[in-house]
């Protein structure tokens, strides 16, 4: 059974941007995720090991947001790549990264 896990409007302070002021001073960013996963195993077992842990996803996104980048497209690409790599249960990702 496929379903979605949502992490909505997670706020981070980070140093992304093309301009010198953006990279020095930093800015607030918001990340929202919609992760498509098969929830059938977790429905049966009630075990977090059979699904995607919200806490682990948050930590992965936080780690990528801490790496300064010029372009939000680059940050978003890293987040998606990291999540697919760390969580093979994820079948699809929709990401919104806002400044």
PLM regions with names:
Residues 1-99:
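N-terminal, polar/charged subdomain of small-to-medium soluble alpha/beta proteins
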